[in-house]
Amino acid sequence: EPLRSPVARPTTRQQRKDRLAKAMTDVGLDPESANRFPHEFSGGQRQRIAIARALVTEPDVLLADEPVSALDVSVRAQVLNLLNDLVRERGLTMVFVSHDLGVVRHLCDTVVVMSSGRVIERGPLADVYGDPQHEVTQELLAAIPRIRVDGSTD
């Protein structure tokens, strides 16, 4: 579907097919499954399809809006690792939108914290996490579950 856009680069059916196969392979899916119905895929596979759809047009910037919030923990880790790999391998800039600052910590270099549609804090990850200036940022960071040495959580 994204390849049917007038701004998409491939012009022939074979070029579109090749681009789709590459995107599916890049996200860990078998290109032969391209004609399956959505209900035939797991939640993690559907998320990978969404990522492939975004990548198929070869963007410079990838907008990931809550890409793992509906996934279970093991699949979430796989998708986050995939996104991290894709950003590194393709030289992409990723705008990662999330309410989960625990996830943001592992994926982002720069953090922008918003509240009620306004930017309330921004900066390098180490600065925002190490010395949060805004009360909302402090509350969000305090809400990140932490594992204690004895294995229990806060």
Show the residue positions of the predicted features.
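A short, proline-enriched helix->beta-strand linker immediately N-terminal to the Walker B motif
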Residues: V56-D60
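Conserved ABC ATPase signature
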Residues: F37-F41, Q45
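Conserved ABC ATPase "signature" region
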Residues: Q14-E32, L141-A142
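Hydrophobic anchor residue at the start of the ABC signature
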Residues: I51, V79
